[in-house]
């Protein structure tokens, strides 16, 4: 935040010299970082329109209002700002209303054309790379595959199990894990539904690659504790796993804890789950983002 603080201060100084009367901060960062921004510059920023989280939020920090709408064009905040008379510095009243973007809302023609063009480009790229068309059916589901962010980032899901099982089985490993933030589909595939190339491409938007490595049982325990440390907030660090089972506790103060006694592992080739051995080395796989950086820049 130190680097951002200097940048924000410079921009605010410029805006005030140019005569700005109502300042809106357009951000894409976690809510805690927006709150820190409001606390630091609250007398100079009237409103923060934020992103990053994918669920609607509304809060006030001092004199600053922070709003975030739902992702995937489900909602939008309409913010009305009106000047009021009097005072040395121009004053304003500002209100916000969360609007559901349902079928009653007219589509923007420019955006419709943009989406159509993007889908054609995507379909062409997929067919050139895989030989499959975007709407080709790959499989039919027997069970519900939950891919919405509140589930994939907060608890075990069949979709997460499937993805990690594929990764683990493909390389004959002890375990595999994928962070919920890497699973981008944000939708469910119903039981008895068709799983198309479109859905498969929507699961992983990033160009992630699998990484195989070894880690100790003690390191596994540490990963699991970090995985659930913000599970109640729907953070992308929550891990979907294969080859191991675990449970965690949430204390009254919101802090989470994973006990080693609540972790079991089914090593490659095994049929039974056994207690986690803290000093044993296990072979595992994950995606290269988690391997290279994970969430170190976010207290990972």
Each model region followed by its residue ranges:
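Second-shell loop/turn segments in exported
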Residues: 1, 148-155, 208-211
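N-terminal start-of-chain detector that recognizes signal peptides
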Residues: 19-22, 38-41, 51-54, 147-150, ...
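Feature captures C-terminal
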Residues: 91, 161-300
